């Protein structure tokens, strides 16, 4: 938003808004009004620092936009004033005054009326709205279709508001918009002759225009009312939406001791607590909660730790950014420390570094796992463990690093059959699965690792065993408890910084700056090595906590791999690939000699042949993840999940003839957003330990959750603001 001199002398300045402002308002009205207060001079602009990851993504977004521009220029040619055809580029306004904006609007409309094939960055200004449309593309019937580029690989509803905004501006200018509007996403699709194109998502303008008009009306009402009174935007004002995640919200979350500070608190739980007149962490810590379910009691326990009123088993004082901090911890009475495997001298501690914004030039496929880092368990006390990095700076190198890593682990398992691979959180497991599917290699090996419990996620142990006084359970928050004075330092301090650093490395390498490239890469390596070391020390600290409480590590049978492949060539280990898949995979090897176009055709065929197997595998991977992670993990964000808070038996067990016994139960809880829960649909019901008779846990040594398929939804409803399901 910005203000222009009033058209009517002596009146207040006119507010001008953009499509981006409507997107902000749709996501967070509080942020919108805070920014409006800054423009009104009611409050200073806060210094939230530079988000290098956001800046990096914005640069890549510009590159994406100009690639699409180049495609249009190649198709239609540059603007030719003599014919009125080609791609017309509207240069940005050199100033933001009313006359200049009106002139740019007139220039854009003139290019459209002249019949330009494409108008790039068409400027619109109607006195209230100002915006620049990425592309307006002429259709055979003379109408213009709105195209917008988004680096995102998936559609966001807010992006459709921008398309509708420019469609509305065309209507106001008397130019017919095509009924189909298009998002050119960052996701790519292979072309039959080789290369790739960006995925285009088409939408119906008449369907989204009413939503845009409603959001615009809300925006104008909100801003008009705010400017009509003298106060700044107030956090928590009734009727004012707030996302809770942006910098403006986070500032107030901390300032007001908001419930969102509680680790693992979600918006639905916060809303339920507000209904109990509980608004702060302190109030939750001190509240009396009659009838509270186990999830709410866990949150209260966490709030007590963060408020300093909960009982603790220890604390650590440390200095960060020149200030002293204290972190406290408590071991839960019912914990998962016994599930930790017995230490083995062959254990390794694993961490990936990946760049989701790296894009392969030939195929357009996003994402590169460029470093597989491992620290081996120290051979003896006082001797540091060996750090082994597996680097990859291309897609082919990524496959080789993946296979080398699998081979390294398999050979190590031959020597140390009781070993485990420790990591923190789900990224490593997810990345290994993704790599096995992408490269059509090592799938059976990765599956076998998962079945045999080789991978040990210490995050699951932490969240089921201890409480800490921090509002996050990231490994970086835990490190003061066990890393002593060896706390993080260096230029690369978190995953976002490592992504930016890797992009800088690529730039230095490609611009012939080998010394700078080597310096950046060394910083990334140090960061990854510290992550691996931190995972090792966390495992040791958890074992110490268990030992202090007389808890021995897991006593289940050692994980002995069945029929380990004797060959180091792990392509032979893909027992779950069919003959056709294996044959096609051979054609895709770098030394196959196939021309690029033929390789592309073989790749498409290979993907089609293995489609159903991959889809089945993805289903079961997701299923066992849910069984392993439980309801405190990502379920509140997952679709097609009903989180049960209460259950009431409506009919006891009964049998109809020879059918299996059944009963009717009413479940009360929350249906996650976007779920397709319908009467007559069949679902899986999952139980937490202790499990019912006949069920075995899906985790290591038979621990974890499990349940049964075949649960039919009979009726859906709502009760006191909560969802109900009769099954």
Regions found by a protein language model. Name each.
Residues 186, 195-256, 267, 276, ...:
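Acidic, Mg2+-coordinating catalytic module of metal-dependent nucleases/exonucleases
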Residues 27, 36, 42-88, 553-692:
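Accessory interdomain/linker segments of ATP-dependent helicases and helicase-like nucleic-acid enzymes
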Residues 110-112, 124-125, 317-418, 436-441:
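Conserved RNase H-like, two-metal-ion catalytic cores of nucleic-acid enzymes
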Residues 2, 20-21, 25, 206-317, ...:
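Cys/His-rich finger/ribbon microdomains and the adjacent scaffold used
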Residues 270, 275-364, 600, 613-639:
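Long, highly charged low-complexity segments
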Residues 1-139:
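Metal-dependent nuclease catalytic cores that hydrolyze phosphodiester bonds in DNA/RNA
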Residues 693-719:
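Short beta-strand-centered aromatic/proline hotspots
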Residues 111, 115-137, 142-224, 376, ...:
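Conserved DEDDh/DEDDy metal-dependent 3′-5′ exonuclease domain
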């Amino acid at each position: 938003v910005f203000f222009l001199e009033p058209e009517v002398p002596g009146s207040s300045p006119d507010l001008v808004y953009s499509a981006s402002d409507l997107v902000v308002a749709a996501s967070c009205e509080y942020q919108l009004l805070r920014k409006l207060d800054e423009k009104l001079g009611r409050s200073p602009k806060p210094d939230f620092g530079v988000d290098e990851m956001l800046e990096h993504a914005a640069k890549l977004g510009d590159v994406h936009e100009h690639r699409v521009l180049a495609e249009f220029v190649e198709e239609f040619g540059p603007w030719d004033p003599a014919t009125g055809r080609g791609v017309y580029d509207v240069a940005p306004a050199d100033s933001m005054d009313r006359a200049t904006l009106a002139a740019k609007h007139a220039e854009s409309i003139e290019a459209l009326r002249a019949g330009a094939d494409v108008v790039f960055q068409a400027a619109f200004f109607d006195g209230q709205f100002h915006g620049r449309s990425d592309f307006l593309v002429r259709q055979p019937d003379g109408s213009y279709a709105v195209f917008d580029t988004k680096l995102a690989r998936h559609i966001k509803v807010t992006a459709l508001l921008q398309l509708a905004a420019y469609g509305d501006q065309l209507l106001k200018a008397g130019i017919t918009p095509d009924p189909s509007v298009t998002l050119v996403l960052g996701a790519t699709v292979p072309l039959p002759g080789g290369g790739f194109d960006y995925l285009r998502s088409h939408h119906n303008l008449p369907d989204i225009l009413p939503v845009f008009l409603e959001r615009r009306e809300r925006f104008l009402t909100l801003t008009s009312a705010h400017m009509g009174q003298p106060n700044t935007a107030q956090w928590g004002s009734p009727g004012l939406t707030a996302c809770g995640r942006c910098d403006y919200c986070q500032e107030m979350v901390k300032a007001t001791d908001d419930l969102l500070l509680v680790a693992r608190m979600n918006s639905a739980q916060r809303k339920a607590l507000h209904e109990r007149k509980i608004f702060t962490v302190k109030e939750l810590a001190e509240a009396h909660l009659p009838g509270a379910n186990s999830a709410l009691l866990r949150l209260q326990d966490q709030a007590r730790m963060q408020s300093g009123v909960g009982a603790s088993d220890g604390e650590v004082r440390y200095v960060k950014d020149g200030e002293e901090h204290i972190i406290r911890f408590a071991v839960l009475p019912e914990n998962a420390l016994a599930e930790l495997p017995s230490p083995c001298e062959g254990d390794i501690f694993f961490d990936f570094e990946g760049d989701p914004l790296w894009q392969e030039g030939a195929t357009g496929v996003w994402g590169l796992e460029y470093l597989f880092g491992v620290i081996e368990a120290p051979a003896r006390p006082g001797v540091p463990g060996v750090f082994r990095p597996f680097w990859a700076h291309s897609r082919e190198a990524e496959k080789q690093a993946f296979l080398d890593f699998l081979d390294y682990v398999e050979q190590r398992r031959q020597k140390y059959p009781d070993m485990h691979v420790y990591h923190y959180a789900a990224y490593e497991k997810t990345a290994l699965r993704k790599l096995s599917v992408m490269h059509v290699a090592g799938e059976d090996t990765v599956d076998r690792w998962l079945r045999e419990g080789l991978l040990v996620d210490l995050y699951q142990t932490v969240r089921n065993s201890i409480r800490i006084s921090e509002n996050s359970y990231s490994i970086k928050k835990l490190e003061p408890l066990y890393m002593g004075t060896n706390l993080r330092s260096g230029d690369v301090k978190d995953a976002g910084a490592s992504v930016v650093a890797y992009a800088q490395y690529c730039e230095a390498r490609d611009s012939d700056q080998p010394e700078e490239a080597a310096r950046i890469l060394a910083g990334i390596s140090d960061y990854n090595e510290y992550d691996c070391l931190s995972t090792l020390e966390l495992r040791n600290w958890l074992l110490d906590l268990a030992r202090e409480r007389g808890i021995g590590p897991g006593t289940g049978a050692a994980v002995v791999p069945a029929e380990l492949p004797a060959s180091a060539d792990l392509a032979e280990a893909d027992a779950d690939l069919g003959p056709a898949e294996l044959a096609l995979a051979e054609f895709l090897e770098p030394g196959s000699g196939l021309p690029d176009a033929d390789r592309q055709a073989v790749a498409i065929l290979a993907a089609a042949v293995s489609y159903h197997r991959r889809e089945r595998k993805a289903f079961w991977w997701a299923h066992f993840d849910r069984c392993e992670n439980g309801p405190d993990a990502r379920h509140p964000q997952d679709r097609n999940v009903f989180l049960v808070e209460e259950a009431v038996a409506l009919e006891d067990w009964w049998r109809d003839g020879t059918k299996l016994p059944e009963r009717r139960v009413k479940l009360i809880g929350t249906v996650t957003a976007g779920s397709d829960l319908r009467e007559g649909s069949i679902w899986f019901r999952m139980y937490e330990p202790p499990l019912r008779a006949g069920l075995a846990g899906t985790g290591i040594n038979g621990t974890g959750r499990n349940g049964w398929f075949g649960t039919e939804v009979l009726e859906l409803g709502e009760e006191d603001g909560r969802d109900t399901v009769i099954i």
